[in-house]
A protein has these predicted regions:
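Glycine-rich helix-loop "coupling/hinge" segments at transmembrane-helix boundaries
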Residues: 502-545
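Alpha-helical membrane-interface segments at transmembrane helix boundaries
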Residues: 30, 34, 335, 340-356, ...
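Transmembrane alpha-helices
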Residues: 450-452, 461, 475-513
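Membrane-topology segments of multi-pass transport proteins
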Residues: 1-33, 39, 52-339
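C-terminal transmembrane helix and the adjacent membrane-cytosol boundary/short C-terminal tail
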Residues: 454-462, 469, 496, 500, ...
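Loop-to-helix entry region at the N-terminal start of transmembrane alpha-helices
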Residues: 340-357, 410-448
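Transmembrane-helix boundary motif in ABC transporter permease subunits
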Residues: 357-389, 402-403, 410, 569-575
C-alpha cells in the first residue's frame, strides 16, 4: 500500500469506493431478483386463473329449446313422451326410426322430472298446450356453443335443384375437403407410415442375420403387409385430392344443404354440384334461403350425428333455441347428465365438514397452544410433545385419511389372548359422513393451529405479562385478559388459514368413503355426502367432454370459497390489530 493511500480519507479511498460500488450493485441485483421472482409467481398465478376461467366460460350458460307440450298426464314418463313428440313434430315428424331415436336424444330424461315437479306444484290444463323450456343434451349444447366440431357455413342461395342433384357454388366446401385430406395424409405419415417403415426395416435386418428363423419371417411378412395397407390408404387420399368429384361417407366430413326448411346430406360433391339425399323432409325448397354447412369432423368420430345437427339448425332458424344462465350449476346436486349437474351438494357437504373441523380443531388447538406456551413446565416431556406436534404438521394428508378409515369407520379389532373374544377400538361411524370427514380434517389441521397460535402467543411482549402479574393478576387472568387479546390476530389468522387448507383436501375424504355419487342434499352431519374437492375429482374422471368446463367451473367456485376464507382472515387480523 502506498503512503498516499494511508493519508487519504476512507470515504475517498479508491479501493473503498470500488467495494462500495460492488456492494451497491449486488444490493440492486438482489432487489431485481426479488421483483423477478414476484413477477414470475404472479404470471404463473394469472396464467392458471386465466386458463381455468377460459375453460369454464361455457359452463355458466346452457341452451334451452322452447316447446309446446300436449300433455296427457303429469307423471314423468308421460311428460318425457310429450317432449319427444313435440321435438319430432317440430322437426317434420320423420318416418325413419333411427332418426327419431337420435332426435329423442336431444334432451335428457331428467328434463321431464323438473317439469313434472313444476306441474304438480302449479297445476295445468291438460286440454291446452303447455309451453316449457327444456335444456338440450350436453353434446347438443357443445355444438351450439361451437365446441363440438368445426362448422363452416357458406351461402347457397340461388341454387338449382333437380331431384337429388343440387347445383351451386361448392368451391369453398371443396377447399375444406382438400385441406382435410392433406391433414389426414400428414397425420398418417407421421403416426403410422414412418413407424411401420422403421419396424419393417428393423425386422428385415434381423431376418438377414437369422435367415432360418420362421417366426421372424412371419413377423416381417406382417410388417410388409401393414406398410402396403398404409401406402394404399395414402394413395387413396392423394387420389381424392386430385379428383374432381368426391364420394362422401361417414368417414369423411359431412356436407349439409338447407333449402328452405328442408335439409339434404351430400353423398358426393364437386366444385359446382352435389348429389344429396334428404335427412329430414320439410317445406318446399326456397332459393332465397339456401345454406351450405361443412362439418369438418367425420360423423363416425363425433358424438352428435348429422340428424341432430339438422334438428338443432332448424330449431335455431325458427327461433326456438335460446341461451340462458346455467342456474343448475349452483342450485342442483350432482347428476349423471352434465346439463343438470350442480355443485350444491358438494358445497353443502364442504360447509358441514368445515363446521365440524372448526368446532373440534380451533378450541382444542388454541387451548393446547396456551398450555404449552404459558403453563407447561420446560422439561424433556414438553420438548418431546412440541417436536412431535411439528412432525404431525409434516405428515401427508392421506395418512390422516387412513387413520380415520381405520379408527372411526372400520375400527381396530384386538384379539384377547387366552379368551375367546376380541376388543374393538373405535369404529361404528358411517362411511361418507360429514362428521367423519370433519374429525379427520380436524386431526390434520390441529398441528397447524397449535403452531400458529404458539407463535402468536410468543410474539406478545413479556412486559405485558410482568405488568399484569405485578398488579396482582393470576397467571390465568393474565392470559385471558391481556395475552390472548393481543395474540388473537395471529391466532385467528393461523386458524382460518388451516381451515382454508382443510377445505381443499381430497385424499383423506376419498379414503373415508366420500367419493360416492350423491344426488341429494345432505340434511345432517350423519348423512351420506360429498365435498367440493371430491366432486371436482369425480367430474374430472368422467368421459364426456361436457364435464371439462363443469370441472373448471367447480374449481373456480372452490377458489372463491378459499379466497373468502383468506380474505376473512386478513380482515379479522386488521380489525383486532387496531
Amino acid at each position: 500500500m502506498q503512503a498516499s493511500d494511508l493519508n487519504t480519507p476512507i470515504s475517498q479511498n479508491p479501493a473503498f469506493l470500488k467495494r462500495m460500488k460492488q456492494r451497491s450493485r449486488a444490493d440492486q441485483r438482489f432487489r431485481y431478483y426479488g421483483l423477478l421472482a414476484i413477477f414470475i409467481a404472479l404470471a404463473l398465478l394469472v396464467t392458471l386463473l386465466v386458463s381455468i376461467t377460459f375453460e369454464a366460460r361455457s359452463a355458466f350458460t346452457r341452451h334451452e329449446v322452447s316447446l309446446d307440450l300436449q300433455l296427457t298426464d303429469t307423471d314423468s314418463r308421460s311428460v318425457y313422451r310429450s317432449i319427444r313428440g313435440a321435438i319430432q313434430n317440430m322437426a317434420g315428424d320423420p318416418a325413419d326410426r333411427d332418426v327419431r331415436i337420435e332426435m329423442s336424444q336431444l334432451v335428457s330424461r331428467l328434463a321431464a322430472g323438473e317439469i313434472t315437479e313444476a306441474l304438480q306444484t302449479s297445476g295445468v290444463d291438460l286440454s291446452a298446450a303447455y309451453p316449457v323450456r327444456v335444456p338440450v343434451s350436453d353434446e347438443a349444447d357443445r355444438y351450439l356453443k361451437g365446441l363440438a366440431t368445426p362448422v363452416h357455413r357458406f351461402d347457397g342461395r340461388g341454387f338449382d335443384q333437380e331431384g337429388s342433384r343440387i347445383e351451386s357454388d361448392f368451391s369453398g366446401a371443396m377447399e375444406i375437403f382438400h385441406r382435410w385430406h392433406r391433414e389426414q395424409i400428414s397425420t398418417i405419415r407421421h403416426r403410422e407410415y414412418e413407424p411401420a417403415l422403421r419396424m419393417r426395416d428393423g425386422l428385415a435386418r434381423q431376418a438377414e442375420a437369422a435367415p432360418g428363423d420362421r417366426q421372424l419371417a412371419m413377423r416381417l411378412a406382417g410388417a410388409e403387409h401393414r406398410v402396403e395397407l398404409i401406402e394404399a390408404r395414402l394413395s387413396d387420399f392423394e387420389a381424392r385430392i386430385n379428383a374432381e368429384r368426391l364420394v362422401l361417407d361417414e368417414f369423411t366430413p359431412s356436407v349439409l344443404f338447407r333449402s328452405g326448411e328442408g335439409w339434404m346430406k351430400a353423398v358426393s360433391i364437386s366444385g359446382g354440384m352435389i348429389e344429396a339425399e334428404p335427412v329430414i323432409s320439410g317445406l318446399d325448397p326456397d332459393r332465397q334461403r339456401g345454406e351450405i354447412l361443412v362439418i369438418e369432423q367425420p360423423e363416425s368420430q363425433r358424438s352428435i350425428p348429422d340428424a341432430q345437427i339438422v334438428v338443432l339448425e332448424r330449431f335455431q332458424t325458427a327461433g326456438r333455441i335460446s341461451s340462458h344462465f346455467n342456474g343448475a350449476l349452483f342450485g342442483n346436486a350432482d347428476s349423471s347428465d352434465a346439463e343438470f349437474a350442480g355443485v350444491l351438494s358438494g358445497l353443502v357437504g364442504s360447509i358441514m365438514i368445515i363446521l365440524v373441523t372448526m368446532g373440534l380443531a380451533v378450541p382444542v388447538g388454541i387451548a393446547a397452544a396456551v398450555y404449552l406456551e404459558e403453563f407447561a413446565p420446560r422439561n424433556r416431556w414438553t420438548s418431546f410433545v412440541q417436536v412431535n406436534i411439528n412432525n404431525l404438521a409434516a405428515i401427508p394428508s392421506i395418512v390422516f385419511g387412513l387413520l380415520g378409515a381405520a379408527i372411526f369407520v372400520n375400527g381396530v379389532i384386538i384379539p384377547i389372548p387366552f379368551v375367546d373374544g376380541v376388543f374393538r377400538l373405535g369404529g361404528g361411524l358411517g362411511r361418507g359422513w360429514p362428521l367423519v370427514g370433519g374429525i379427520v380434517l380436524a386431526l390434520m389441521t390441529l398441528p397447524t393451529i397449535i403452531i400458529a397460535s404458539r407463535a402468536a402467543l410468543g410474539a406478545v411482549p413479556g412486559s405485558v405479562r410482568q405488568a399484569a402479574l405485578a398488579m396482582g393478576a393470576t397467571r390465568l387472568q393474565t392470559v385471558n385478559h391481556h395475552v390472548l387479546p393481543m395474540a388473537s390476530p395471529g391466532i385467528l389468522t393461523g386458524s382460518i388459514i388451516g381451515l382454508a387448507q382443510a377445505i381443499g383436501e381430497t385424499a383423506p375424504l376419498l379414503l373415508i368413503g366420500m367419493v360416492a355419487f350423491v344426488a341429494e342434499m345432505p340434511q345432517g352431519a350423519t348423512d351420506r355426502a360429498t365435498a367440493l374437492p371430491v366432486l371436482i375429482f369425480q367430474w374430472s374422471t368422467r368421459a364426456e367432454r361436457a364435464w371439462e368446463p363443469m370441472t373448471s367451473a367447480a374449481i373456480i367456485i372452490l377458489l372463491l370459497v378459499m379466497l373468502v376464507l383468506n380474505g376473512l382472515a386478513v380482515l379479522m387480523r386488521l380489525r383486532y390489530e387496531k
